[in-house]
Amino acid sequence: MLKLIKIEIEGFKSFADPISINFDGSVVGIVGPNGSGKSNINDAIRWVLGEQSAKQLRGLNMDDVIFAGSKTVKPQEKAMVKLTFKNEDAIEETKQIFTISRLLKRGQGTNEYFYNDQPVRYKDIKNLAVESGISKSSLAIISQGTISEIAEATPEQRKAVIEEAAGTSKYKLDKEEAQKKLIRTNDAIDKLQGAIKELERQVNSLDKQASKAKIYLEKSKALESVEVGLIVNDLNFFNEKLNNLNTSLLEVEQQRNDLELNIQTYESSISQTVHFKTEVESSIQEITSKLDNLKNALSEINLQEARIEERRKLIISGEIVVDQKTKIEEIKKQVESLKIQINASKQREIELDQQLTRLNAKANSLKLQENDINKEIGVLLEKKSAAAANINILKQQFENKSFLSKGIKTIKDNSFLFDGYIGLASELFKVESEFSLAIETVLGAALNQIVMKTSEDVLQAIDFLKKNLSGKATFIPLTSIKEREVREDHLLVLKGQKGFLGVAKELIEFDTQFNKLFGFLLGNILVVDNVDNANRIAKILDHKYTIVSLEGDLFRPGGTITGGSKLERTSILNYDIKIKEHTNTLKFAEDQIHDLKIKQQTIYNEIETVNSTIQQVKIEANSINSKLNILNEELNNLKLNASEIFKEQQEDQESLNLSFDSEKLNIEKQISTLTIELNSKKDRLTNLISEQGKGETKKQELDAKLRKLNTQHSDSITEQNRAKFLVEQNQKRLSEHYKLTLEAASEQYSLDLDIEQARHFVDSLKKELKELGNVNLEAITEFEEVNQRYQEKKQYIEELTTAKSKIEEAISDLDKIIINKTTEIVNLVNNEFNMVFQKMFGGGKAEIHFTDKNDILNSGVEISAQPPGKTIKNLRLFSGGEKAIIAISLLFAILKARPIPLCILDEVEAALDESNVIRYVEFLKLLKENTQFLIITHRSGTMSRVDQLLGVTMQKRGVTSIFSVELSKAKEMLKDELK
């Protein structure tokens, strides 16, 4: 027999102080005034045995079982109840003693259970209670309300008490669990059948798709084996063609530059010829003018001769009478007038000579300037040619990316494969030339590191490099890096330092989306003007930061210094700078050539103007000289007095004629000489025109060659672009479709077929693949996965069907056990019930029976009772006391038929009269050998017959105390209730 030997309570309900109750007898009475906390002992035992309902413990929530405090005692923070049991059936040496306990802390809402002070689960306590028969069942804890419930219960409700006695609770729980499993199994089978039907439809569809996909893959594999080799062949061909075109373009560029130099030389020569032609034309104009003047002078002489002859004839004939005095006066006036004209002519001649000298000097100066300009243009054309050649070389190197490592070049060439690709670090910012060396020095290899969005993108790129055996590359995933910065207090110190130019990040230009990137790369890098200031600032900051000078001297944290002469740099940044420098040189040369040609044309125009002015001055000077000679001659004639004139006119007529003859002869000689010179100049002009024509013809030939070269250059560029496009298309096909680089493809594939055969084979396979239409390549994997799920679910539904059969079989077995045990207990109880009933009533008869013997599982249990001298059979018609005795008799019959270790009776005899109380207690004594009773009572008949009596009172208000008490003392305690 299992016996409760001790209960310990602390902080549970009214038990504020720790109490320990030892139970010495098999029937223990617990007495005390109403409200003293007797029933709290019942609640404490119910609670420790696993009661989960606060309502059953007369509270709103579980924290209500913790002592809430009183006016004199503060609240407790926890409730703990411990029950100690002893197994009396074991031999003395091995009698087992064990404890079960439960602990609840205020506000935590979690209960802790212990077995022998070791933490266990609620389930463990529940199982222990059920197995040992000390559970919180309706038989283990019986109150006055329980008695009424049994008496007033329906047959179905009453059957629950019988089933507890039968011990079918475990089997009913097992059955309920099995039924739940059966429902779940049926639900699972229903769901599986729907899923299997859908999977079967998918399997059939995917099977067709997978077959089509396999054909597609086979043809694709065959296509790949040839097309990749063909692409490699085409790429090699077009790359070689590109190299040849690049070389050809460089040669064409050089030829164009040479032709431009030759054309410039011819343009200069033609310009000089035009200049000489202008001079000759000017000379011809001058000679022609002189000839015209001489011819005019000759005509004048002939005219004078005619006038003199006419005058002579008139004088001889006496027709002219000369008034000497008047004539002299006229002559004087003419002389004065002629003198004024002569002086004016001489002055103008001097001015013209001076102007001519100045103009000749200016013409010479302009010719010298023209020569200098031609030399400058020649030098600039050479610079232009060199700059253009350098730009082409740099662009070719840049396009080939020869300065990048294999891994970086591979990723850059195939960047379109990676959604997270952003670019090389050097491509994402701009820097002024002043800071370029410093920034490039401090970044070093990081310039060519590849910036990606995430670390997953980096892993994808690394996998691509490994797969294609394309070397290594360093990556910067934006999501993984953290910005670096200079402390605010250090910045305040730096702002006042000589030579400090700024934080490197602030000296470059970049898109705001890369703020984190350049914070990571340059956020804590300081830029200083020279090495001395860098050294000084490094010491001030205790070598905490990397410092770089404009010359590229590097001071690293910790104190190391790197410096020396500049080396050739090979980054994209450097290529950009070099190309920009050469482009600027080319632009400057082109602008200078343009400006010089404008200046040269201005000089040409000015030379033309000067030559024209010189010609006009010379013509004017010749005219003045001729006029001056005539005036001087007239003046000399006028100086002769009238008589002398008259005399001379008569006497020297022949001499004057001779003078005119002499002058005419002289003029004719001059005309002859000038005519010869004029013819010579005309010949020279003809030669110059011919020379100019040849030069222009040659220039036109060179222009034609240049146009041809330009056309050739344009055609080569078009062909180059086409070749580049085809290279890009083939590389894209290779990368996107086959995930291969050219190097990897070259190593893995070779073309065994003739080129044309290969192209025909590829075209044919592509056509066949196209004819297949839309192909779901995932269908193969999907088919395997779906088919596997289909087979698994088919197998699972078979297992569930088997399990369902087993569950149904188990339920059937459990039903048999429940029926057998229930039938057995009803028979056993019936055997005891009539005997107990007769003892309690002093005769009569009673029995229990199923309401439906054909359906015991669902049948209720009815009580038939007939006390002595009465014929009443309906329980509802009995008095309250009679119903209580009938219910107690049934409970005692059950306990006798199926004893339990512990039974708590809470004022169950309250409705009995004193004689029946005595019968009630005496019968308990008959049961105490197999069951321990804790009786909460107010009845003296009960108190006087128990083995041990415990008193319950509240010595402190609101706090329950327990102690052993004698019967007389107990009656004293309960005198008010006994009245």
UniProtKB/Swiss-Prot annotation:
InterPro entries xref list: P-loop_NTPase (IPR027417), RecF/RecN/SMC_N (IPR003395), SMC (IPR024704), SMC_hinge (IPR010935), SMC_hinge_sf (IPR036277), SMC_prok (IPR011890)
Record's signal peptide: none
GO cellular component, one term: chromosome
Membrane-crossing segments per the record: none
Localization annotation: Cytoplasm
Domain SMC hinge: 419-538
Pfam families found in the cross-reference section: SMC_hinge, SMC_N
Coiled coil residues, start to end: 169-400, 572-716, 750-818
GO terms under biological process: chromosome condensation; chromosome segregation; DNA replication; sister chromatid cohesion
Main location (coarse class): cytoplasm
GO molecular function: ATP binding; ATP hydrolysis activity; DNA binding
Gene3D superfamilies referenced in this protein's UniProt entry, alphabetically: 1.20.1060.20, 3.30.70.1620, P-loop containing nucleotide triphosphate hydrolases
UniProt: ATP binding residues: P33, N34, G35, S36, G37, K38, S39, N40
Comment field on protein domains: Contains large globular domains required for ATP hydrolysis at each terminus and a third globular domain forming a flexible SMC hinge near the middle of the molecule. These domains are separated by coiled-coil structures.
Family: Belongs to the SMC family.
PANTHER family assigned to the protein according to its UniProt record, in alphabetical order: STRUCTURAL MAINTENANCE OF CHROMOSOMES PROTEIN 3
Subunit structure: Homodimer.
Biological function: Required for chromosome condensation and partitioning.
Protein name: Chromosome partition protein Smc
The species this protein was found in: Mesomycoplasma hyorhinis (Mycoplasma hyorhinis)
Encoding gene (name): smc
